């Protein structure tokens, strides 16, 4: 009798991706975040679908519809807060996943890495548009400030902004199209994730040592399925704890005030996961310069494979590179903190120094440390 798992057209793909997939025997818990991101994505799509059933994308009723979801819909409050905090968990896993990739040299799988950055950008766009939908003060002013950045583009900037707005200001047309894009983009993310996995399975997974592990592979199931399930349970536990005990911990109180174009909040800021990029944007006094720095803060990741100078792949045996990596991590935490602070001294100068250091570490310090370590390995 034929084994359906190995011979059926559809089951064969699933089998080769999640069951019989040859996996390095020594990958640590840092490799769990890929599956956790998958779980976050599924959770977001399901909760988002139920929210979309009750939400209305109209400036007059959007805020009221979110209130209605929380008050009148059965477990609407739970679905809404799972969706909001699920986004935070999504980005936490994303940042840890990218950090793992940098530390262990996974970026040398160029196609997988580039696909991952495209996924990051798409996810950031989706999250930004989702933040606009409740139509609170921070939603409205966040949308106004961020979309207005496009006006820094020479010649076509103003026309481009009005084209995105669908009006002469952030209004009903903007909210409707943001809702449409926020609904469709997660399905694009699912498709891009499949391409990401396709490229990954072409090369096989990296491992902590960065050494080729062709001779030491084990099947993905049951070893890593069990390990992933443990990670998933832990993630869901953290998410449920956050949602049930402190649902507004990571949100902004200003978003509980309905959007008012005549009243600007004292301090406009995005969600915590965008604060590092927002701090880099604000650190440059010139508008176009700030926008370019903001773009480069993400696009610089595309250059990681080109900036790799070390003869070793992973940082596990490279103490100098480890120091620069943790310096980068600390710098990103400082930028995140600065992004949440008002634009006044000493925050301005700290933000400028942290922004310079961010680019300096990636473009200069990391490649130089790789070269120094290469010379140190010569006996």
UniProtKB/Swiss-Prot annotation:
GO terms for molecular function: metal ion binding; ubiquinol-cytochrome-c reductase activity. One of its GO terms (cellular component) is respiratory chain complex III. Heme b b566 binds at residues 97, 196. It is a multi-pass membrane protein. Coiled coil: none annotated. Its cofactor is heme b. It is found in: Mitochondrion inner membrane. The chain crosses the membrane at residues 33-53, 77-98, 113-133, 178-198, 226-246, 288-308, 320-340, 347-367. Keywords: Electron transport, Heme, Iron, Membrane, Metal-binding, Mitochondrion, Mitochondrion inner membrane, Respiratory chain, Transmembrane, Transmembrane helix, Transport, Ubiquinone. Signal peptide: none annotated. The cytochrome bc1 complex contains 11 subunits: 3 respiratory subunits (MT-CYB, CYC1 and UQCRFS1), 2 core proteins (UQCRC1 and UQCRC2) and 6 low-molecular weight proteins (UQCRH/QCR6, UQCRB/QCR7, UQCRQ/QCR8, UQCR10/QCR9, UQCR11/QCR10 and a cleavage product of UQCRFS1). This cytochrome bc1 complex then forms a dimer. Component of the ubiquinol-cytochrome c reductase complex (complex III or cytochrome b-c1 complex) that is part of the mitochondrial respiratory chain. The b-c1 complex mediates electron transfer from ubiquinol to cytochrome c. Contributes to the generation of a proton gradient across the mitochondrial membrane that is then used for ATP synthesis. Belongs to the cytochrome b family. This is Cytochrome b. It comes from Hemiechinus auritus (Long-eared hedgehog). The gene is MT-CYB.
């Amino acid at each position: 009798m034929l084994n359906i798992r190995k011979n059926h057209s559809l089951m064969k793909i699933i089998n080769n991706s999640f069951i019989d997939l040859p996996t390095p025997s020594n990958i640590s818990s840092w490799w769990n975040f890929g599956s956790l991101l998958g779980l976050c994505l599924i959770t977001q799509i399901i909760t988002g679908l139920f929210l979309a059933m009750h939400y209305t994308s109209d400036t007059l009723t959007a805020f009221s519809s979110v209130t209605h979801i929380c008050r009148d819909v059965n477990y609407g409050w739970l679905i809404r807060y799972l969706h909001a905090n699920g986004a935070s968990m999504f980005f936490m896993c994303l940042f840890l996943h990218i950090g793992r990739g940098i530390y262990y040299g996974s970026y040398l799988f160029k196609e997988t890495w580039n696909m991952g950055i495209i996924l990051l950008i798409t996810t950031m766009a989706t999250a930004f548009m989702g933040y606009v939908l409740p139509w609170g003060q921070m939603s409205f002013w966040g949308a106004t400030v961020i979309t207005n950045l496009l006006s820094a583009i020479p010649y076509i900037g103003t026309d481009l902004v009005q084209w995105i707005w669908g009006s002469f200001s952030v209004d009903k047309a903007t909210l409707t199209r943001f809702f449409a894009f926020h609904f469709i983009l997660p399905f694009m993310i699912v498709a891009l994730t499949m391409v990401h996995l396709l490229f990954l399975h072409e090369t096989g997974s990296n491992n902590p040592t960065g050494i080729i592990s062709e001779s030491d592979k084990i099947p993905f199931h049951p070893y890593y399925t069990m390990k992933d399930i443990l990670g998933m349970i832990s993630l869901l536990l953290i998410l449920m704890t956050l949602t049930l005990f402190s649902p507004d911990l990571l949100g902004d109180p200003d978003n509980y005030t309905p959007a008012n174009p005549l009243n600007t909040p004292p301090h406009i800021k995005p969600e915590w996961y965008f604060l590092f990029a927002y701090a880099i944007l604000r650190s440059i006094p010139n508008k176009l310069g700030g926008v370019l720095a903001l773009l480069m803060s993400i696009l610089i990741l595309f250059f990681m494979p080109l900036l790799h100078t070390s003869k070793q792949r992973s940082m596990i045996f490279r103490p100098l590179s480890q120091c620069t990596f943790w310096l980068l991590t600390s710098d990103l935490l400082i930028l995140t903190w600065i992004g949440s602070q008002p634009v006044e001294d000493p925050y301005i100068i700290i933000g400028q120094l942290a922004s310079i250091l961010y680019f300096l570490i990636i473009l200069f310090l990391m490649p130089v440390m790789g070269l120094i370590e290469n010379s140190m390995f010569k006996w």
